[in-house]
Amino acid sequence: MRSPAALLPVVADGGGGVGVEEEMDVDEDMAMCGGRGGGGGEKKRRLSVEQVRALERSFETENKLEPERKARLARDLGLQPRQVAVWFQNRRARWKTKQLERDYAALRQSYDALRADHDALRRDKDALLAEIKELKGKLGDEDAAASFSSVKEEEDPAASDADPPATGAPQGSSESDSSAVLNDAEILPHKPAPAAAADAAASEETEAVVTGAALLHHAEVFFHGQLLKVDDDEAAFLGDDGAACGGFFADEHLPSLPWWAEPTEQWTT
Protein backbone atom coordinates (compact mmCIF):
# COMPACT_ATOMS: atom_id res chain seq x y z
CA MET A 1 0.00 0.00 0.00
CA ARG A 2 1.38 3.39 -0.98
CA SER A 3 1.78 6.26 1.39
CA PRO A 4 -0.18 9.47 0.91
CA ALA A 5 2.98 11.23 -0.13
CA ALA A 6 3.55 8.80 -2.93
CA LEU A 7 0.17 9.69 -4.39
CA LEU A 8 1.11 13.36 -4.84
CA PRO A 9 1.89 14.45 -8.40
CA VAL A 10 5.50 15.10 -9.18
CA VAL A 11 7.04 17.70 -11.48
CA ALA A 12 10.49 18.01 -12.94
CA ASP A 13 12.61 20.74 -11.32
CA GLY A 14 15.00 23.06 -13.08
CA GLY A 15 17.99 20.88 -12.23
CA GLY A 16 16.69 17.86 -14.11
CA GLY A 17 15.51 16.11 -10.95
CA VAL A 18 12.03 15.34 -9.75
CA GLY A 19 10.23 17.56 -7.20
CA VAL A 20 6.88 17.48 -5.40
CA GLU A 21 4.29 20.24 -5.15
CA GLU A 22 4.22 20.17 -1.36
CA GLU A 23 7.13 20.01 1.02
CA MET A 24 7.51 16.60 2.59
CA ASP A 25 9.20 15.56 5.73
CA VAL A 26 12.78 14.35 5.33
CA ASP A 27 12.07 11.16 7.19
CA GLU A 28 9.15 10.37 4.97
CA ASP A 29 11.24 11.08 1.89
CA MET A 30 14.05 8.86 3.12
CA ALA A 31 11.73 6.06 4.26
CA MET A 32 9.94 3.40 2.36
CA CYS A 33 6.47 2.63 3.54
CA GLY A 34 5.72 -1.00 4.17
CA GLY A 35 2.56 -2.93 4.78
CA ARG A 36 0.58 -2.65 7.94
CA GLY A 37 1.71 -4.88 10.74
CA GLY A 38 -0.23 -6.53 13.51
CA GLY A 39 0.07 -3.44 15.66
CA GLY A 40 -1.68 -1.42 13.04
CA GLY A 41 1.35 0.89 12.83
CA GLU A 42 3.04 1.94 9.60
CA LYS A 43 6.57 0.61 9.25
CA LYS A 44 9.26 2.73 7.64
CA ARG A 45 12.46 1.43 6.14
CA ARG A 46 15.34 3.86 5.97
CA LEU A 47 18.20 3.81 3.47
CA SER A 48 21.20 1.79 4.40
CA VAL A 49 24.71 3.14 4.74
CA GLU A 50 25.83 1.53 1.46
CA GLN A 51 22.89 3.09 -0.42
CA VAL A 52 23.66 6.52 1.03
CA ARG A 53 27.34 6.25 0.08
CA ALA A 54 26.44 5.21 -3.48
CA LEU A 55 24.06 8.16 -3.78
CA GLU A 56 26.73 10.52 -2.40
CA ARG A 57 29.26 9.35 -4.98
CA SER A 58 26.70 9.84 -7.73
CA PHE A 59 25.84 13.31 -6.40
CA GLU A 60 29.49 14.36 -6.29
CA THR A 61 29.82 13.29 -9.92
CA GLU A 62 26.72 15.22 -11.01
CA ASN A 63 24.20 16.96 -8.78
CA LYS A 64 21.53 17.00 -11.44
CA LEU A 65 19.42 13.89 -11.76
CA GLU A 66 18.27 12.78 -15.19
CA PRO A 67 15.35 10.33 -15.63
CA GLU A 68 17.55 7.58 -17.09
CA ARG A 69 20.11 8.06 -14.32
CA LYS A 70 17.38 8.01 -11.69
CA ALA A 71 15.96 4.72 -13.02
CA ARG A 72 19.44 3.16 -13.17
CA LEU A 73 20.30 4.20 -9.59
CA ALA A 74 16.95 2.91 -8.32
CA ARG A 75 17.48 -0.39 -10.06
CA ASP A 76 21.10 -0.78 -8.88
CA LEU A 77 20.39 0.17 -5.27
CA GLY A 78 17.03 -1.65 -4.97
CA LEU A 79 15.15 1.57 -4.36
CA GLN A 80 12.17 3.19 -5.88
CA PRO A 81 12.79 6.06 -8.34
CA ARG A 82 10.76 8.29 -6.06
CA GLN A 83 13.18 7.69 -3.17
CA VAL A 84 16.19 8.50 -5.35
CA ALA A 85 14.57 11.74 -6.57
CA VAL A 86 13.66 12.89 -3.05
CA TRP A 87 17.16 12.12 -1.74
CA PHE A 88 18.80 14.16 -4.54
CA GLN A 89 16.43 17.04 -3.88
CA ASN A 90 17.24 17.17 -0.18
CA ARG A 91 20.93 16.68 -0.83
CA ARG A 92 20.98 19.53 -3.31
CA ALA A 93 19.29 21.82 -0.79
CA ARG A 94 21.88 20.95 1.85
CA TRP A 95 24.67 21.47 -0.69
CA LYS A 96 23.34 24.93 -1.53
CA THR A 97 23.13 25.76 2.14
CA LYS A 98 26.74 24.69 2.71
CA GLN A 99 27.83 26.57 -0.39
CA LEU A 100 26.16 29.68 0.96
CA GLU A 101 27.89 29.14 4.28
CA ARG A 102 31.26 28.81 2.56
CA ASP A 103 30.62 31.89 0.46
CA TYR A 104 29.51 33.78 3.55
CA ALA A 105 32.65 32.70 5.42
CA ALA A 106 34.86 33.82 2.51
CA LEU A 107 33.01 37.12 2.21
CA ARG A 108 33.21 37.61 5.96
CA GLN A 109 36.95 37.02 5.89
CA SER A 110 37.37 39.49 3.03
CA TYR A 111 35.21 41.98 4.87
CA ASP A 112 37.27 41.63 8.04
CA ALA A 113 40.50 42.13 6.07
CA LEU A 114 39.08 45.19 4.32
CA ARG A 115 37.81 46.55 7.61
CA ALA A 116 41.24 46.13 9.17
CA ASP A 117 42.84 47.91 6.20
CA HIS A 118 40.23 50.64 6.45
CA ASP A 119 40.92 51.13 10.14
CA ALA A 120 44.67 51.21 9.51
CA LEU A 121 44.22 53.78 6.74
CA ARG A 122 41.98 55.85 8.98
CA ARG A 123 44.60 55.82 11.73
CA ASP A 124 47.27 56.83 9.21
CA LYS A 125 45.01 59.59 7.96
CA ASP A 126 44.40 60.89 11.46
CA ALA A 127 48.14 60.79 12.19
CA LEU A 128 48.93 62.67 8.98
CA LEU A 129 46.26 65.26 9.71
CA ALA A 130 47.69 65.78 13.18
CA GLU A 131 51.20 66.12 11.73
CA ILE A 132 49.98 68.60 9.11
CA LYS A 133 48.24 70.61 11.80
CA GLU A 134 51.41 70.64 13.90
CA LEU A 135 53.55 71.70 10.93
CA LYS A 136 51.08 74.46 10.07
CA GLY A 137 51.29 75.67 13.65
CA LYS A 138 55.09 75.70 13.54
CA LEU A 139 55.04 77.46 10.17
CA GLY A 140 52.66 80.07 11.53
CA ASP A 141 54.91 80.64 14.55
CA GLU A 142 57.97 80.97 12.30
CA ASP A 143 56.17 83.45 10.04
CA ALA A 144 55.06 85.48 13.04
CA ALA A 145 58.59 85.46 14.46
CA ALA A 146 60.05 86.48 11.09
CA SER A 147 57.58 89.33 10.70
CA PHE A 148 58.28 90.49 14.26
CA SER A 149 62.04 90.45 13.69
CA SER A 150 61.66 92.36 10.42
CA VAL A 151 59.53 95.01 12.11
CA LYS A 152 62.09 95.26 14.92
CA GLU A 153 64.94 95.65 12.42
CA GLU A 154 63.02 98.41 10.66
CA GLU A 155 62.39 100.22 13.94
CA ASP A 156 66.04 100.04 15.11
CA PRO A 157 67.55 102.05 12.19
CA ALA A 158 64.82 104.66 12.58
CA ALA A 159 65.69 105.09 16.27
CA SER A 160 69.41 105.30 15.53
CA ASP A 161 68.80 107.97 12.89
CA ALA A 162 66.69 110.01 15.29
CA ASP A 163 69.39 110.04 18.05
CA PRO A 164 72.15 112.76 17.86
CA PRO A 165 75.74 111.62 17.27
CA ALA A 166 77.47 110.70 20.54
CA THR A 167 81.03 111.66 19.52
CA GLY A 168 80.32 115.39 19.24
CA ALA A 169 81.91 115.64 15.82
CA PRO A 170 80.27 118.00 13.30
CA GLN A 171 77.62 116.41 11.15
CA GLY A 172 79.43 117.35 7.97
CA SER A 173 82.63 115.61 9.05
CA SER A 174 81.52 112.28 7.72
CA GLU A 175 80.62 113.81 4.38
CA SER A 176 83.91 115.72 4.20
CA ASP A 177 85.86 112.63 5.18
CA SER A 178 84.10 110.61 2.55
CA SER A 179 84.72 113.31 -0.05
CA ALA A 180 88.40 113.48 0.98
CA VAL A 181 88.67 109.75 0.64
CA LEU A 182 87.06 109.95 -2.78
CA ASN A 183 89.42 112.75 -3.85
CA ASP A 184 92.43 110.78 -2.66
CA ALA A 185 91.13 107.75 -4.50
CA GLU A 186 90.79 109.86 -7.65
CA ILE A 187 94.24 111.46 -7.31
CA LEU A 188 96.28 108.47 -6.27
CA PRO A 189 95.74 106.41 -9.44
CA HIS A 190 97.06 109.37 -11.56
CA LYS A 191 100.44 109.64 -9.75
CA PRO A 192 103.32 108.80 -12.07
CA ALA A 193 105.34 105.74 -11.45
CA PRO A 194 108.82 106.16 -9.89
CA ALA A 195 110.55 105.32 -13.17
CA ALA A 196 108.48 107.89 -15.07
CA ALA A 197 109.23 110.54 -12.42
CA ALA A 198 112.96 109.83 -12.66
CA ASP A 199 112.89 110.15 -16.44
CA ALA A 200 111.05 113.46 -16.23
CA ALA A 201 113.56 114.82 -13.69
CA ALA A 202 116.51 113.76 -15.87
CA SER A 203 115.02 115.43 -18.95
CA GLU A 204 114.38 118.65 -17.01
CA GLU A 205 117.97 118.62 -15.70
CA THR A 206 119.35 118.13 -19.22
CA GLU A 207 117.30 121.06 -20.52
CA ALA A 208 118.57 123.22 -17.66
CA VAL A 209 122.20 122.35 -18.44
CA VAL A 210 121.76 123.14 -22.15
CA THR A 211 120.04 126.42 -21.37
CA GLY A 212 122.82 127.42 -18.93
CA ALA A 213 125.53 126.67 -21.50
CA ALA A 214 123.76 128.75 -24.13
CA LEU A 215 123.43 131.67 -21.74
CA LEU A 216 127.14 131.55 -20.89
CA HIS A 217 128.10 131.54 -24.58
CA HIS A 218 125.98 134.57 -25.43
CA ALA A 219 127.25 136.46 -22.41
CA GLU A 220 130.83 135.85 -23.45
CA VAL A 221 130.19 137.09 -26.99
CA PHE A 222 128.50 140.22 -25.72
CA PHE A 223 131.35 140.92 -23.30
CA HIS A 224 134.06 140.65 -25.99
CA GLY A 225 132.14 142.98 -28.30
CA GLN A 226 132.00 145.68 -25.67
CA LEU A 227 135.77 145.34 -24.99
CA LEU A 228 136.58 145.91 -28.68
CA LYS A 229 134.51 149.09 -28.76
CA VAL A 230 136.24 150.47 -25.68
CA ASP A 231 139.69 149.90 -27.29
CA ASP A 232 138.71 151.92 -30.41
CA ASP A 233 137.53 154.87 -28.38
CA GLU A 234 140.70 154.90 -26.34
CA ALA A 235 142.90 154.97 -29.50
CA ALA A 236 140.98 157.98 -30.86
CA PHE A 237 141.52 159.98 -27.75
CA LEU A 238 145.27 159.17 -27.62
CA GLY A 239 146.02 160.81 -31.03
CA ASP A 240 145.74 158.13 -33.48
CA ASP A 241 143.92 160.35 -35.92
CA GLY A 242 143.95 157.97 -38.72
CA ALA A 243 142.76 155.34 -36.49
CA ALA A 244 140.46 157.85 -34.86
CA CYS A 245 139.15 159.23 -38.12
CA GLY A 246 139.10 155.98 -39.61
CA GLY A 247 137.44 154.70 -36.61
CA PHE A 248 135.07 157.67 -36.40
CA PHE A 249 134.12 157.87 -40.08
CA ALA A 250 134.45 154.29 -40.78
CA ASP A 251 131.37 152.22 -41.00
CA GLU A 252 130.46 151.37 -37.54
CA HIS A 253 130.10 147.77 -37.05
CA LEU A 254 126.80 146.95 -35.72
CA PRO A 255 127.14 145.55 -32.33
CA SER A 256 126.06 142.09 -31.96
CA LEU A 257 122.55 141.67 -30.77
CA PRO A 258 122.11 140.90 -27.16
CA TRP A 259 121.81 137.29 -26.34
CA TRP A 260 118.09 137.52 -25.77
CA ALA A 261 117.44 138.95 -29.27
CA GLU A 262 119.60 136.58 -31.30
CA PRO A 263 118.13 133.97 -33.57
CA THR A 264 116.98 130.84 -32.03
CA GLU A 265 119.44 128.73 -34.02
CA GLN A 266 122.22 129.71 -31.59
CA TRP A 267 120.28 128.24 -28.71
CA THR A 268 120.68 124.85 -30.17
CA THR A 269 124.52 125.14 -30.62
Curated annotation (Swiss-Prot):
Compositionally biased, Polar residues: which spans? 170-180
Free-text tissue specificity from the UniProt record: Expressed in leaf blades and panicles.
> Methyltransferase: is it a keyword of this entry?
no
Q: Name one GO cellular component term.
A: nucleus
| Alphabetized Pfam families for the sequence | HALZ, Homeodomain
Tell me the compartments it is located in: Nucleus
What protein name is recorded for this chain? Homeobox-leucine zipper protein HOX20
What is the protein's species of origin? Answer: Oryza sativa subsp. indica (Rice)
Give the source lineage, highest ranks first: Eukaryota, Viridiplantae, Streptophyta, Embryophyta, Tracheophyta
